[in-house]
Amino acid sequence: EGIDVSKKKILNCLNAKHHYISPNNFYSLRECSNYESLDFIYSKNLINTSKFHRILISEWFKFCKLGGKIIIEIQPNKLLNFDELIKECKLLLKNKINILFMEKNILVLEKKKNYLKKKDSINCWSFGIITDGQREDWLENEINSIISLKIPHFEILICGPYNGEKRNVVKIVQFKSDKPLICAKKNLICKNAKYENICITHNKFIFNKNWYTGMKKYGNYFEILSCKIQDHDRTRAGDWITYGSKWDKISKIGLMNYMDWDKYGYLDGGLYILKKSVWKSVPWNSKLLWGEGEDLDISRRFYENGYVSRINIFSICNTLKWNHGKFKLFEFNNQKLGKIKHSCNYPIWYLKQLIKKYLLRRKING
């Protein structure tokens, strides 16, 4: 059984159904196929009709069975040419594929490794909470919200001072430093995590009662995720954002439409959902302190190493503190990052961030 995902039906063989989906960040074949079930996936002149080629490649791999084939025909354009397609497939899929054919703008891939690691299950989770010992009531509320999810197998790892109630599911990860080394703390949590599915937060989040149900609806086939994050008044609190320009340029940070995606998109440092195997490949830079752009750094390295960050809109977390105000929204554009109009106080906000980073590092270094 296979599927033709081209915009217009090309294949006429009996075992190939046609299912076209307009490419965007929501692209998935989950409504028409089971994961890792298809003998082949065929696409003609779809891969570079938009900027979402990384999402298409990743999704096709998820639904192709072991030994199955992914056949991509491409009409080269300014978004992606044939050589770039081959390079992207190698980067994204790594050692999980064999290239069977690559001539005349036709690429044929064979899947040789399953997507999920052994024992990886949506019913098994390691939650990590970074704390500095303050706001103990917030920390207890977050712990209780996780326990209330009633996940079959889970643990809660706390890195930082904790004097709360002793519970079997709560484990303390020792960290001996007064410096705000949040990246080192996140690495310690991931190192000690029992399960492949990890969710790391700062101690300021409450998990919505349907968070776990939303994760099951999204599915276990992901690398790095954000979920919806809401402020006290239910406005978006940095849940799906982009730097808005090249990493070495002055930022134009703003929110993205949930169905949008950008190569300079990044996840705010307060919450990450990721696989332990991804962390092993791309750990946090332990030398970076809070406020030194550690979220930008790891998001850039995720992208450069071929991991695709997405957002799960079926799950919600509420933040008890959001310091960055309301970001403007980029307009959706399937070819490039859309337009945004920043409010007049944006340069002031950006300058404050630079000053805060400088003063923090100066204080720590004496």
Describe the predicted segments one by one.
Residues 212-245:
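Conserved donor NDP-sugar-binding/catalytic core segment of glycosyltransferases
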Residues 311-331:
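Active-site donor/metal-binding and catalytic loop motifs
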Residues 269, 281-300, 304-311, 316-317:
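Donor nucleotide-sugar recognition loop
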Residues 141-153:
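Short, acidic, metal-binding catalytic loop of nucleotide-sugar glycosyltransferases
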Residues 54-66:
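A short glycine-rich, Lys/Arg-flanked "PGG" loop and its adjoining helix->strand segment in the class I
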